[in-house]
């Protein structure tokens, strides 16, 4: 497996003495070079002594030497400066386009490294590297967690940047879409994003002093004021409900005025959803947040602490929704505020990523730092991923930790991408007597 040979070379997970070219010259690897992930030789600017002479240049690596010709390197001038060709099997001499014959060295993946790598790929245990975790140094774990946390924010920044583009460059609109998406709390996330992109905020702004009109705007665009969206057993009661009919009438007026097109209500999911998370309630909460002018990016940027963010995003519902979860069915009265846990999730999944993305966009380090500060202030999330890492011995204390470990599982463990993981490196390095 060529990828594994690359890895062994890059990290020097092979005996560093007794190395020789196929024609018997001693080889000393001083610097394996810079790994190239684009077109051209695999490693740039390597430093290798061959027969006592120091060479600085490129190194190419293959499973078999004949892959050189299979990949047509003999016709590519980019390979003229290869100072060493490394392969696990040397079955032919190789030649550059210039007519030179680069020295070749056979490099075998140490048996223990190969066995441990195959174990990582094939084991049913999860995570595959669980045995080594208790022995990892705190410094190594902290360093890797910090990198993963940043990587996760960078990944979310890409999604936010795309939303900004979709919103014609408006960061305010992109923030509203991100906030709304995370009001879906996973199950309805896609539906909420679709809905939020159908909300013309400039048009809504003309009616922001009228909460009922905002609810009509928001619920109408969600398709939830369509009678067909109401379960049949509640339809007649809803049609006799003065608040529902008033909202429906108001939305029809707004739809005509602004040329609105509602989304298909079938996109909303209700199965196995707690009533508190029904889209009606979440949209009612967002309506109130918008009405009180607490759903804007400018207000968020003024918050310098988690406490201030909680106060900003704390929301409630109108009297009608205190006794309803859907139209047409009355329920016991409850305030239906956003819970502390839900607020924390909004800070983790909306606030921190938006601050980080906006800070990078504006080259304003204070917002990026604030994003990290908020994640380090909040306690770790409680979910099956966090519990798994705790069970194998990792300390998970802050939201920054839990976000890092979610990134680790989704982007490395689930993809079996152990060769890019620092824990995977420790696992493979520990399987060899070589300390790279």
Q: Predicted regions span which residues?
A:
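A surface-exposed, charged beta-strand/loop segment in the N-terminal or early-internal portion
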Residues: 60-138
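Short, structured segments at the rim of ligand-binding sites
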Residues: 39, 76, 421
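N-terminal "leader" segments that precede or initiate the main folded domain
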Residues: 1-7
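Extended, acidic-biased charged interface segments
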Residues: 118-172
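Acidic, carboxylate-rich catalytic segments that either coordinate divalent cations
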Residues: 391-436
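Catalytic micro-motifs at enzyme active sites that drive phosphoryl/nucleotidyl and oxygen chemistry
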Residues: 32-37, 45-50, 67-75, 90-96, ...
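Hydrophobic, aromatic-lined core segments that form the binding pocket/scaffold
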Residues: 149-404, 417
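N-terminal ordered "arm"
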Residues: 7-66
């Amino acid at each position: 497996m060529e990828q594994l040979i690359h890895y062994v070379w890059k990290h020097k997970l092979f005996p560093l003495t007794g190395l020789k070219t196929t024609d018997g010259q001693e080889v000393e690897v001083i610097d394996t070079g810079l790994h190239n992930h684009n077109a051209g030789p695999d490693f740039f600017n390597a430093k290798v002594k061959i027969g006592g002479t120091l060479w600085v240049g490129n190194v190419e690596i293959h499973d078999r030497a004949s892959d050189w010709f299979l990949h047509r390197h003999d016709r590519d001038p980019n390979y003229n400066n290869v100072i060493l060709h490394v392969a696990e099997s040397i079955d032919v001499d190789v030649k550059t386009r210039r007519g030179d014959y680069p020295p070749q060295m056979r490099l075998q993946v140490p048996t223990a490294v190969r066995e441990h790598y195959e174990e990582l790929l094939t084991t049913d245990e999860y995570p595959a590297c669980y045995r080594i975790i208790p022995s990892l140094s705190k410094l190594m774990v902290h360093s890797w967690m910090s990198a993963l946390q940043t990587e996760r924010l960078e990944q979310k920044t890409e999604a936010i940047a795309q939303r900004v583009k979709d919103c014609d460059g408006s960061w305010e609109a992109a923030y509203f879409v991100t906030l709304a998406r995370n009001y879906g709390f996973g199950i309805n996330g896609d539906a909420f994003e679709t809905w939020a992109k159908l909300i013309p905020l400039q048009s809504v702004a003309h009616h922001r002093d009228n909460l009922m009109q905002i609810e009509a705007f928001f619920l109408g665009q969600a398709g939830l004021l369509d009678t067909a969206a109401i379960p049949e057993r509640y339809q007649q009661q809803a049609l006799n409900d003065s608040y529902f009919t008033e909202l429906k009438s108001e939305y029809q007026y707004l739809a005509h005025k602004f040329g609105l097109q509602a989304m298909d209500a079938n996109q909303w999911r209700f199965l196995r959803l707690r009533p508190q998370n029904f889209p009606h309630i979440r949209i009612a909460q967002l309506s109130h947040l918008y009405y009180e002018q607490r759903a804007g990016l400018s207000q968020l940027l003024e918050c310098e602490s988690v406490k201030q963010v909680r106060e900003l995003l704390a929301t409630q519902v109108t009297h009608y929704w205190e006794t309803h979860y859907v139209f047409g069915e009355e329920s016991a009265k409850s305030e239906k505020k956003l819970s502390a846990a839900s607020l924390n999730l909004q800070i983790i999944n909306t606030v921190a990523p938006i601050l980080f993305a906006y800070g990078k966009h504006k080259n304003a380090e204070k917002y990026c730092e604030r994003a990290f500060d908020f994640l380090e202030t909040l306690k770790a999330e409680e979910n099956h991923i966090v519990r798994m890492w705790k069970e194998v011995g990792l300390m998970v204390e802050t939201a920054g930790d839990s976000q890092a470990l979610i990134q680790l599982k989704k982007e490395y463990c689930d993809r079996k991408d152990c060769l890019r993981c620092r824990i995977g490196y420790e696992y493979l390095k520990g399987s060899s007597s070589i300390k790279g």
